[in-house]
């Protein structure tokens, strides 16, 4: 399963700088503990050891793509988000899109056109993958925004790596 996060300009040759840096974030269950992993630019993961997921491509100089691959699933909930780390506009106005390729089928997600009041530090919570004990995978679009990438947004309890105990739509 390859989980692709692809960023492309609105039209070829157009790069207005509105979304200079969009970073992908994947969280999910660890295979060997009750904690959760968090893959992003500073913690790229591994395909050969737990969490069996990795940020393969992290484009820091242009408009993507960023590619995250999950090599082996552990039962639980995986969450994929895009953080608008740097730029002069909002993630909604950016040319961002997420491509999820699962079992040979590609689904494309684009930022929902809602409030444009979120600033540079806004986060697009794109989707969740729920993996059952038999290996079945359910894709659930989340398509919400928040103003910061907090532990609750990443589905972990601060400092513990564990899912939140209560609250929100977690």
Where are these regions (language model features)?
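Intrinsic-disorder/low-complexity signal
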Residues: 1-170
